[in-house]
Design a protein with these regions (language model features):
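N-terminal beta1-alpha1 cap of cysteine-dependent amidohydrolase-like domains
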Residues: 1-188
Length: 188
């Protein structure tokens, strides 16, 4: 991991973690090392040597601004090749076509439109409650080259609003989505 206070990468925590795995009978084939910065060749060699894997089997799981960049990052570091070699499939595997991944990233960096959707739910304060719904809206936005901004609205906050206050709350929304749920709380 990258230690910000020291301003450098430290390999010892990874070495110790792999040692514990080996004590439990688990031998790593590949190391995916979480890091904010890329691993240098020296760090890869050192980790490979002390963790009993090849330097090519040490891959940085870099922090990225967009989750859809991860396959491209792993490909750039050769993880796909290492996996194919491990399973004896490298010689017969076709060259990967990453065009769609590049298109997704390009679309997300250059949306042509923007839309705001209100999601009215009972548990909007819990971050992962509507995760699949959020991702579905993001995917729909990518398909339409449109950035989807979601306004999370707790359903109970709407119960006692006047019609005018409700209209003001909904002003600026291109659409409203009410996820399915159980019970009547907040949805009447």
């Amino acid at each position: 991991p990258y230690i910000e206070t020291a301003g450098e990468l430290k390999t010892k925590p990874t070495q110790q973690a792999v040692k514990k795995l080996m004590e439990s009978g688990i031998q790593a084939d590949v190391l995916l090392c979480r890091s904010k910065v890329a691993l240098g060749d020296d760090e890869r060699r050192k980790l490979g040597l002390f963790c009993n894997v090849g330097a090519d089997d040490v891959v940085a799981a870099l922090d990225v601004k967009n989750i859809y960049e991860i396959p491209l990052s792993y490909h750039a570091q050769g993880l796909d090749v290492q996996v194919l070699k491990h399973f004896g499939m490298y010689e017969t595997a076709p060259e990967p076509d990453l065009t769609k991944w590049h298109n997704i990233i390009n679309t997300m960096e250059n949306f042509e439109h923007k839309v705001k959707i209100g999601v009215i739910g009972k548990y909007c304060g819990l971050p992962d409650t509507y995760k699949s719904l959020k991702e579905a809206l993001v995917h729909a936005g990518i398909a339409m080259k449109t950035k989807v901004d979601i306004e999370w609205i707790e359903s109970e906050t709407l119960e006692n609003l006047t019609e005018q206050a409700f209209e003001e709350k909904m002003n600026g929304l291109a659409g409203i989505l009410v996820p399915g749920g159980f019970g009547a709380r907040g949805c009447e």
